[in-house]
Swiss-Prot record:
<dbReference type="GO" id="GO:0000122">
    <property type="term" value="P:negative regulation of transcription by RNA polymerase II"/>
</dbReference>
<keyword id="KW-0804">Transcription</keyword>
<dbReference type="GO" id="GO:0009887">
    <property type="term" value="P:animal organ morphogenesis"/>
</dbReference>
<dbReference type="GO" id="GO:0003214">
    <property type="term" value="P:cardiac left ventricle morphogenesis"/>
</dbReference>
<dbReference type="GO" id="GO:0048371">
    <property type="term" value="P:lateral mesodermal cell differentiation"/>
</dbReference>
<comment type="function">
    <text>Probable transcription activator for a number of lung-specific genes.</text>
</comment>
<dbReference type="GO" id="GO:0048613">
    <property type="term" value="P:embryonic ectodermal digestive tract morphogenesis"/>
</dbReference>
<dbReference type="GO" id="GO:0071345">
    <property type="term" value="P:cellular response to cytokine stimulus"/>
</dbReference>
<dbReference type="GO" id="GO:0045944">
    <property type="term" value="P:positive regulation of transcription by RNA polymerase II"/>
</dbReference>
<dbReference type="GO" id="GO:0090131">
    <property type="term" value="P:mesenchyme migration"/>
</dbReference>
<dbReference type="GO" id="GO:0001756">
    <property type="term" value="P:somitogenesis"/>
</dbReference>
<dbReference type="InterPro" id="IPR001766">
    <property type="entry name" value="Fork_head_dom"/>
</dbReference>
<dbReference type="GO" id="GO:0060441">
    <property type="term" value="P:epithelial tube branching involved in lung morphogenesis"/>
</dbReference>
<protein>
    <recommendedName>
        <fullName>Forkhead box protein F1</fullName>
    </recommendedName>
</protein>
<dbReference type="GO" id="GO:0031016">
    <property type="term" value="P:pancreas development"/>
</dbReference>
<dbReference type="GO" id="GO:0007498">
    <property type="term" value="P:mesoderm development"/>
</dbReference>
<dbReference type="GO" id="GO:0045198">
    <property type="term" value="P:establishment of epithelial cell apical/basal polarity"/>
</dbReference>
Length: 378
C-alpha cells in the first residue's frame, strides 16, 4: 500500500509539474504575438501629402532641369521628398503609373535610339501648363478639369467672320489691278458695300420707271478699305436713287441679302440686251461668275460679275423666256479663274436689321446650303 502511495505523488506531482511547465512554456508564446500586434498597431504610417498624384508628378517633373523624368526618377523624387512613400506600402506606385498614362497633361517622349534601358521620359503638355501656374498644387475640387477646359482659348470662327484666318487662296482680284489680301477686308460696322456694288452692277441697265432706293450703310462699311488700286472708279458709291435692273420689278423694294454681285464695270448694256431683258424669266440661276472672254460672250465686256454664291432672282413677270435666248445661261471664264474658290461669308444674322426695306413683291434670295463650281464652257 505504501508503494502505490509513494508512487502517486510523484506521478501526480509529475503531472502537475508537467502541466505547470507546459503552462509556463505556452504563456510566453501566446503573449509574444499579442505584444507584437500591439506594437504594430501603435506605429502609424506617415500622413499622405495633401496633393493629388497629378500635382506630385508635376512637382517631380518641374524639379528636373530638363523638365522630363523617367518613371523610376519620379519614384525617387517622391520617396526623397515625402516620408509617406518610404514605407512598406507600395500601392502608390500603381497610382503614379495610372495618372501618367490616363491624363492628357502628361506626354510620353519617344526613347532615343542610343539610350539604353526601357524607361521613357515623361514631360508636361505645354497646353496644360497653365493649370499649375504659381505652384497651385493643392487638390482640385470635383469638376476642375472641365472648368479648365472651358477656360482654354477658343479660336473657332463664329458665323464665318474670322478674317485673320482666311487662307491666301481667298485673295480676290478685280479687273483693273485691284487686289485685296484677306487681312485687308475691313469690317467697319455696316453693309455699305451693297451701295457701291449694286450701283455698279445696275448702272448700265437704265430704265426710267425702275429705281432702287439707296441702301443704308452703318458707319460707311466698305470691303475695299484696305485695297490698293482704282477702287473708286470700278466700285462707285451713289448717294441718290440709281436706275435699277429690269430684273427687279417697279415698286418692289424687296429684301436683298448681302451676298451681292460684284461688278467690275459700269458700262451701258447694249440696247438689244436691255430690250430682251425687259420681260425676264420666272427664275434665273446665276452661277459664280468671273471676268470672261469678250470674244465668246458679248455681255462679258460690259458686265463682268463675281457672284459670291448662287442667287435666285424671283420674278413676277408673266412673259415667256423666249426673249432671253440671246443671253447665255452660264458665263464662261478662263481656266485660271475657274479654279478659284468662292468668297463665302455668312452675314445673314448681321444684315437682317439693316438690309430690310419697305414694300413687297419680289426679293433677292441666295442659296447658302450648297455651292458648285461649273466647268468652263467657252
Amino acid at each position: 500500500m505504501s508503494a502505490p502511495d509513494k508512487q502517486q505523488p510523484p506521478h501526480g506531482g509529475g503531472t502537475g509539474g508537467g502541466g505547470g511547465a507546459g503552462g509556463q512554456a505556452m504563456d510566453p508564446a501566446a503573449a509574444g504575438p499579442t505584444k507584437a500586434k500591439k506594437t504594430n498597431a501603435g506605429v502609424r504610417r506617415p500622413e499622405k501629402p495633401p496633393y493629388s498624384y497629378i500635382a506630385l508628378i508635376v512637382m517631380a517633373i518641374q524639379s528636373s532641369p530638363s523638365k522630363r523624368l523617367t518613371l523610376s526618377e519620379i519614384y525617387q523624387f517622391l520617396q526623397a521628398r515625402f516620408p509617406f512613400f518610404r514605407g512598406a506600402y507600395q500601392g502608390w506606385k500603381n497610382s503614379v503609373r495610372h495618372n501618367l498614362s490616363l491624363n492628357e497633361c502628361f506626354i510620353k517622349l519617344p526613347k532615343g535610339l542610343g539610350r539604353p534601358g526601357k524607361g521613357h521620359y515623361w514631360t508636361i503638355d505645354p497646353a496644360s501648363e497653365f493649370m499649375f501656374e504659381e505652384g497651385s498644387f493643392r487638390r482640385r475640387p470635383r469638376g476642375f478639369r472641365r472648368k479648365c477646359q472651358a477656360l482654354k482659348p477658343v479660336y473657332s470662327m463664329v458665323n464665318g467672320l474670322g478674317f485673320n484666318h482666311l487662307p491666301d487662296t481667298y485673295g480676290f482680284q478685280g479687273s483693273g489691278g485691284l487686289s485685296c489680301a484677306p487681312n485687308s477686308l475691313a469690317l467697319e460696322g455696316g453693309l455699305g458695300m451693297m451701295n457701291g456694288h449694286l450701283a455698279g452692277n445696275v448702272d448700265g441697265m437704265a430704265l426710267p420707271s425702275h429705281s432702287v432706293p439707296h441702301l443704308p450703310s452703318n458707319g460707311g462699311h466698305s470691303y475695299m478699305g484696305g485695297c490698293g488700286g482704282s477702287a473708286a472708279g470700278e466700285y462707285p458709291h451713289h448717294d441718290s436713287s440709281v436706275p435699277a435692273s429690269p430684273l427687279l420689278p417697279a415698286g418692289a423694294g424687296g429684301v436683298m441679302e448681302p451676298h451681292a454681285v460684284y461688278s467690275s464695270s459700269a458700262a451701258a448694256w447694249p440696247p438689244a440686251a436691255s430690250a430682251a431683258l425687259n420681260s425676264g424669266a420666272s427664275y434665273i440661276k446665276q452661277q459664280p461668275l468671273s471676268p470672261c472672254n469678250p470674244a465668246a460672250n458679248p455681255l462679258s465686256g460690259s458686265i463682268s460679275t463675281h457672284s459670291l454664291e448662287q442667287p435666285y432672282l424671283h420674278q413676277n413677270s408673266h412673259n415667256g423666256p423666249a426673249e432671253l435666248q440671246g443671253i447665255p445661261r452660264y458665263h464662261s471664264q478662263s481656266p485660271s479663274m475657274c479654279d478659284r474658290k468662292e468668297f463665302v461669308f455668312s452675314f445673314n444674322a448681321m444684315a437682317s436689321s439693316s438690309m430690310h426695306t419697305t414694300g413687297g413683291g419680289s426679293y433677292y434670295h441666295q442659296q447658302v446650303t450648297y455651292q458648285d463650281i461649273k466647268p468652263c464652257v467657252m
